[in-house]
Amino acid sequence: GSIDGDGAAAMRYTEARLSKLAEEMLRDIEKDTVDMQLNFDDSLKEPVVLPCRFPNLLVNGASGIAVGMATNMPTHNLGEVIDGCVAYVKNAVARVENPEVEPITVAELMEHIKAPDFPTGGTIYGYQGVRDAYETGRGRIIIRSKAEIETEDNGRERIVIGELPYGVVKSDL
């Protein structure tokens, strides 16, 4: 899908030029580091997950529906996620060295991973939904558009929307 409401791409549209970071996501894939499964038409094998060297699931998010369950995990900023992972590992090492050290809390992780980072921008309205999502796995995050009022040469004003909430299709506006 896309911001224009296009449907998901078929296999013939999935060719891409990889960035260095994307190449890291595929490193060691031939070494049986992850399970493989048949693709949509059983013609090829594909990885169940990518053998990524960073927490790609948090960075790219996930969305899906299955029988009796669903998930909708938003995208996050790569730098913030790495900082959160470093804090988590440092805490784990400190706990091994000193068993009296408390496990890192969600609030402490949120000092590094502040909130989801949506690709189309927008402003998160309120913070309680983010906190709820991180603490319980369930939360409601409301995103507002970012807009400006511009004055045209003829004196008329117009509203220019610069950032849309994630998931909003332009043509539906």
Each model region followed by its residue ranges:
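Catalytic phosphate-handling regions of large nucleic-acid enzymes and associated NTPases
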Residues: 1-137
